[in-house]
């Protein structure tokens, strides 16, 4: 039996980002967005539009690449969870003009919180990097706060955990879903076919 699939359109994602941006501005106010590629890139860019305050500069977006999912060896476009997280791209703190993360509110963005393994890894490594930079710069007294935004959170047992403060205060999700395949428009090879599935689902999806 095929797994249940939930199809979401670009409009769906846009609206979820807009709704959550209000909550993020009320409680977190990020200085920097870090998008986990590739699923976090589009949500991060949409989110930045709604987080921009009038008269202020755009919030900078930095990118990291992590791989946990592996493509199935078949004609299917679906992916299955891998066994470990692998870095494919990371922040270079030595790069000229690199955004300073010490003492900032940093919002990590991804498309889905599935097993939570990727988010846990990203948060742990970024916390470690910021702590090292704070020590080098003699700024260990400055508090750096992390938040997380995901378009979807799958309601299921997780393989890893996040800091309690983040879960209680700074964890934002556009929608909670059951444990099923989530079909995003940026993964579609035929966007018209994808949108037809979205239309057929109507209000059935969360």
From Swiss-Prot:
UniProt-annotated binding residues for GMP: 110-118, 154, 181-187
EC main group: transferase
Reaction(s) this enzyme catalyzes, per UniProt: IMP + diphosphate = hypoxanthine + 5-phospho-alpha-D-ribose 1-diphosphate; GMP + diphosphate = guanine + 5-phospho-alpha-D-ribose 1-diphosphate
GO molecular function: guanine phosphoribosyltransferase activity; hypoxanthine phosphoribosyltransferase activity; metal ion binding; nucleotide binding; pentosyltransferase activity; xanthine phosphoribosyltransferase activity
Isomerase keyword on record: no
Major place of residence: endoplasmic reticulum
Residues forming the catalytic site: 114
Superkingdom, taxonomy of origin: Eukaryota
Methyltransferase among keywords: no
CDD domains xrefs: PRTases_typeI (cd06223)
Note on cofactor: The magnesium ions are essentially bound to the substrate and have few direct interactions with the protein.
Enzyme Commission identifier(s): 2.4.2.8
Cofactors, names only: Mg(2+)
GO biological process, one term: GMP salvage
The entry's keywords: Endoplasmic reticulum, Glycosyltransferase, Magnesium, Metal-binding, Nucleotide-binding, Purine salvage, Transferase
SUPFAM superfamilies: PRTase-like (SSF53271)
Protein's cellular compartments: Endoplasmic reticulum
CC terms in the record's Gene Ontology section: cytoplasm; endoplasmic reticulum; nucleus
InterPro entries linked to this entry: PRibTrfase_dom, PRTase-like
Subunit structure, interactors included: Dimer.
Similarity field: Belongs to the purine/pyrimidine phosphoribosyltransferase family.
Function (record text): Converts guanine to guanosine monophosphate, and hypoxanthine to inosine monophosphate. Transfers the 5-phosphoribosyl group from 5-phosphoribosylpyrophosphate onto the purine. Plays a central role in the generation of purine nucleotides through the purine salvage pathway.
This protein's name: Hypoxanthine-guanine phosphoribosyltransferase
């Amino acid at each position: 039996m095929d797994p249940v699939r939930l199809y979401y359109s670009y409009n769906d994602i846009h609206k979820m980002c807009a709704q959550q941006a209000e909550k993020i501005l009320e409680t977190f106010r990020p200085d920097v967005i870090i998008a986990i590629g590739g699923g976090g890139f589009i949500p991060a860019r949409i989110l930045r539009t709604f987080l921009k305050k009038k008269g202020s500069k755009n919030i900078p977006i930095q990118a990291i690449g992590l791989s946990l999912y592996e493509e199935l060896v078949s004609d299917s476009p679906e992916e299955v969870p891998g066994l470990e997280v692998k870095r494919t791209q990371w922040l270079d703190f030595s790069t000229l003009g690199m955004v300073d993360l010490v003492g900032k509110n940093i919002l990590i963005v991804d498309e889905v919180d599935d097993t939570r393994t990727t988010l846990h890894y990203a948060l742990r490594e970024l916390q470690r990097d910021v702590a090292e930079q704070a020590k080098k710069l003699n700024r260990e007294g400055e508090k750096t706060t992390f938040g997380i935004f995901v378009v979807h959170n799958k309601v299921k047992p997780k393989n890893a955990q996040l800091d309690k403060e983040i879960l209680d205060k700074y964890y934002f999700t556009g929608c909670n879903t059951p444990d099923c395949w989530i079909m995003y428009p940026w993964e579609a090879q035929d966007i018209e076919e994808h949108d037809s599935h979205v239309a057929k689902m109507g209000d059935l999806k969360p």
